[in-house]
Design a protein with these regions (language model features):
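An acidic/histidine-cluster motif and surrounding catalytic segment
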Residues: 1-103, 107-190
Length: 190
């Protein structure tokens, strides 16, 4: 990472107008937030904000759940899901951007240097009826390099773009004030 900070990035133009980015980070992991800030600085991404994540691994999150605690989710999945909903809600309350980029604090931007396109080119290629476009996946061995409909093994919440309409729909469906309603059969795959 030290090399990343000291080198001049001749590919930074590829992420021009990338954002707003909402980076989800646990309070107890400041080193991961520093890592993300280093990447954003290296790539000259300045439209980003940290979202304090809910930690479901050790904490009982029943105080932020409205209704029945979801039985088909682990506590970590509840923390992840509610953190993403919190980020979406914050985006809707603080920005008028037509889209937001949701990114977790372990997402690497290293491969951007190999892009033969710019962010604005990719964004222009989104289908007219898009809701969410996944920018990072958990690699299961098959890598699809073209924009495509979701495959069964393409899952991850590491980094995705969500449009305002879809974020509004998810927040309307799952947020009740400062609480989250997840008893409608939600089963994340992250």
């Amino acid at each position: 990472m030290d090399q990343l900070v000291t080198d001049t990035n001749k590919s930074a133009f590829k992420l021009k107008n990338f954002g707003p980015v909402y980076c989800i980070n646990l309070d107890g992991q400041p080193e991961r937030w520093q890592y993300m800030q280093s990447q954003f600085n290296f790539w000259e991404v300045d439209n980003y904000e940290r979202i304090s994540a809910y930690d479901g691994r050790d904490d009982d999150l029943s105080d932020i759940i409205k209704g029945k605690y979801p039985e088909n989710m682990t506590s970590g999945e509840v923390g992840c899901t509610t953190s993403h909903l919190k980020a979406m809600k914050h985006y809707l309350e603080t920005s008028d951007s037509p889209y937001a980029i949701m990114m977790e604090d372990d997402c690497s931007l290293d491969l951007v240097k190999f892009w033969n396109f710019k962010w604005t080119d990719l964004y222009a290629y989104f289908p007219y009826d898009w809701d969410v476009v996944q920018l990072a996946i958990i690699c299961t061995g098959d890598i699809h390099v073209r924009l495509h409909k979701r495959f069964v093994n393409d899952f991850s919440t590491a980094c995705y773009v969500i449009n305002r309409h879809h974020a509004e729909k998810l927040v309307r469906f799952h947020c009740r004030g400062d609480k989250y309603k997840l008893d409608q059969g939600v089963k994340p795959r992250a």
